[in-house]
Amino acid sequence: SPASGFFGMR
C-alpha cells in the first residue's frame, strides 16, 4: 500500500 511506502521512506 502507498502508506507503507511513505512511512518506509521516512
UniProtKB/Swiss-Prot annotation:
Domain of life: Eukaryota
GO cellular component: extracellular region
Expression sites by tissue: Expressed in the antennal lobe (at protein level).
Main location: secreted
Subcellular location: Secreted
Modified residues (Arginine amide): 10
Alphabetized UniProt keyword annotations: Amidation, Neuropeptide, Secreted
BP GO terms, sorted: neuropeptide signaling pathway
Protein name: Tachykinin-related peptide 4
